[in-house]
Amino acid sequence: MRVWIDADACPKAARDLIVKFALKRKFEVVMVAGQAVAKPAFAIVRLIVVPSGMDAADDYLVEHAVPGELVICSDVPLADRLVKKGVAALDPRGREFDERNMGDRLAARNLFTELREQGQVGGGQGAYGEREKQAFANALDRIIARLSKS
């Protein structure tokens, strides 16, 4: 079992939760980033820094993650590529990406991108608080249990 993290966009609190789960359940964590990020000092955690470039980390994740593994990412187009490949994907707020919801998630992402470009809505998501951490922990637990049975 392996959990991949799109580390450039994943909150530290979510990364810490993943490592805590990994230590308890004995699975590998691979953090992929376009720049150096703090790597927890545990042997089960690897950090891969990819050459900078448009979507370099995304491309690496799609190329290396395989069905039966989980990728933590906020990027909806990346999640779509992973789901099409049969890889489980979860955002740091506890929302799982799957074939049933990808169309809606992509449409919402595209709409908000257009509205932001037109200046009609502000930037990103709200703060990453206790509610988000708890939702993420619950979803992570559920998905890891499901993938471990496969």
From Swiss-Prot:
Show the InterPro entries listed in the entry: UPF0178
Pfam families referenced in this protein's UniProt entry, alphabetically: DUF188
Which domain of life does this protein belong to?
Answer: Bacteria
Query: What's this protein's family per the entry?
Result: Belongs to the UPF0178 family.
- In its UniProt entry, what is this protein called? UPF0178 protein PputGB1_5282
Q: Which organism is it from?
A: Pseudomonas putida (strain GB-1)
